[in-house]
């Protein structure tokens, strides 16, 4: 059985390069420290997801991501759209700086970012104080888990713990929009 982690133990696991599962707005997510290449590569290996696809990161505020994203490069109206949508279930592709790691952005010239209002995600990001990878807790191509009970036992056996809680009310994972163009990339 995979350990249930309180916030302090979740932060300790993340600090040590661990991969954890936690509920998000619609589905269960897997997370790790995106600043640690080995942690991200382990998470991608668990999911069988190619690094070229990149990952979403969640954070307690956009300020936590200033080294990686250049929100000021957006037109004022677009920047306002992004900032007024947070915290909330909105994932935006933001322009990156040259310090954004390729193991996080993949082959893209932007970074997918969400400042979540989901209570578990918000509490975890607040306790962690840094960006956190947020990708669905499933193998690539498989349906995402909507409950802890639906998490694949084989996947659970490969991670370092679970932060308990309930998913939010969204029926689908969050919409992804390009902040530069406003284009919807995932609906």
Curated annotation (Swiss-Prot):
The lineage of its organism: Bacteria, Pseudomonadati, Pseudomonadota, Gammaproteobacteria, Lysobacterales. It comes from the Bacteria. Its EC number is 2.7.7.87. Belongs to the SUA5 family. TsaC subfamily. GO terms for biological process: regulation of translational fidelity; tRNA threonylcarbamoyladenosine modification. GO terms for molecular function: ATP binding; double-stranded RNA binding; L-threonylcarbamoyladenylate synthase; tRNA binding. It catalyses: L-threonine + hydrogencarbonate + ATP = L-threonylcarbamoyladenylate + diphosphate + H2O. The keyword Cell membrane does not apply. The keyword Nucleotidyltransferase applies. One of its GO terms (cellular component) is cytoplasm. It is found in: Cytoplasm. Residues 4-187 form the YrdC-like domain. Keywords: ATP-binding, Cytoplasm, Nucleotide-binding, Nucleotidyltransferase, Transferase, tRNA processing. Required for the formation of a threonylcarbamoyl group on adenosine at position 37 (t(6)A37) in tRNAs that read codons beginning with adenine. Catalyzes the conversion of L-threonine, HCO(3)(-)/CO(2) and ATP to give threonylcarbamoyl-AMP (TC-AMP) as the acyladenylate intermediate, with the release of diphosphate. It is an enzyme of class 2 (transferase). This is Threonylcarbamoyl-AMP synthase. InterPro entries: DHBP_synth_RibB-like_a/b_dom, Sua5-like_dom, TC-AMP_synthase, TC-AMP_synthase_SUA5. Gene3D superfamilies: DHBP synthase (3.90.870.10).
């Amino acid at each position: 059985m995979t350990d249930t982690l309180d916030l302090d133990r979740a932060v300790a696991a993340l600090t040590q390069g661990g991969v954890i599962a936690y509920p998000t707005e619609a589905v269960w997510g897997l997370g790790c420290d995106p600043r640690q290449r080995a942690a991200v590569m382990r998470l991608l290996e668990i999911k069988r997801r190619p690094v070229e696809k990149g990952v979403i990161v969640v954070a307690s505020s956009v300020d936590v991501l200033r080294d990686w994203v250049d929100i000021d490069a957006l037109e004022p109206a677009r920047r306002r759209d992004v900032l007024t949508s947070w915290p909330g279930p909105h994932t935006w592709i933001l322009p990156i700086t040259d310090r954004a790691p390729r193991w996080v952005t993949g082959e893209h010239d932007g970074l997918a970012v969400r400042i979540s209002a989901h209570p578990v995600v918000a509490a975890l990001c607040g306790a962690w104080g840094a960006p956190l990878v947020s990708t669905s807790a499933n193998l690539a191509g498989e349906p995402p888990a909507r409950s802890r009970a639906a998490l694949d036992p084989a996947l659970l056996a490969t991670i370092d713990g679970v932060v308990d809680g309930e998913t939010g009310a969204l029926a689908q994972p969050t919409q992804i929009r390009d902040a530069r163009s406003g284009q919807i990339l995932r609906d």
